[in-house]
């Protein structure tokens, strides 16, 4: 018997709660969640953040000034049924009628357990943030309680349609919004190219150690290159140690640590090139944000890349692991900085009319209202809350 863990529907519209399964640690899902919740509240749509404990040893974004955060003790990643029962009081305290669990078995398990209370009237919106087996397994397992599935790229939406053919009407695409320059950029051709990476400093998924190979390759080429590395993660010490031991005559590197999301716009605006080595993505937020500020993206051929980048016109796409091609593209751009300016302004134009905040927020609220008009979530009592 589950009691006292239901959510009272608010007056005046849906009340949404987003889960941060590993707290406010560095990552695109975190920055998207923090920014969207803030905008929703500014537009009088009630939103709360359920902030779980962070990964051990990871830096977190500062959130002392946030009134929309409720802290939940315990890491949701890999949480078992006992931990999930412990999360219930916090989830109940947000009094939401729409939940967005994001990427964790523990967060989906908690809302599934909540739904077993017959007095609860909740809906679940499942965001597929990455073209990854984990997401597809997660959403397939919890399909019984999900009202809407939102893919962040066409690749993801196509995959969802294949694995969930009975839910075609409940699958939609919503691409992240970004800030876009209102004017063209005029880079200083006399300065070295500034190449920026913004994201998790992690080998898993991000393949961040490819950065070392890129440095080595550029060190053997003509030109001068300045790198800015913004982020935190388990491979940060390895990267900094490598650069401390290895001197490059034409490659300089700044490690900026975890940069607040609101400062990233200026960082992209002061950079010439953005890079992404990822093994898989959904629709890289750093790629979109950098393009909006006129950075030329050089990224791997993952979900979202070909959807937003025309190779050679609004950026460059290389195969995963093909660092040599990435280095050659950077060297060629250094030798022809007029082309950097041309592609930079093409990037700004390509995202200007497709990633507005107001349009995104209106579409998101529309999805919430469609969910509220449908049936409430109810987990099958014969199915385990989390897989055995």
Task: Name every feature range the model reports, one short phrase each.
Residues 30-35, 202-217, 234-237, 324:
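A conserved mid-protein helix/loop that constitutes part of the nucleotide-sugar donor-binding site
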Residues 146-183:
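Donor nucleotide-sugar binding/catalytic pocket of nucleotide-sugar-dependent glycosyltransferases
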Residues 279:
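Aromatic "clamp/platform" in nucleotide-sugar-dependent glycosyltransferases that forms part
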Residues 258-259, 266-271:
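Short alpha-helical donor nucleotide-sugar binding micro-motif in glycosyltransferases
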Residues 296-299:
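Short hydrophobic beta-strand element within catalytic cores of glycosyltransferases
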Residues 240-259:
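Nucleotide-activated donor-binding/catalytic signature segment of Leloir-type glycosyltransferases, i.e.
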Residues 101-108:
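Short His-centered aromatic/hydrophobic patch
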Residues 187-206, 212-215, 228:
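Conserved donor-binding/catalytic core segment of Leloir-type glycosyltransferases
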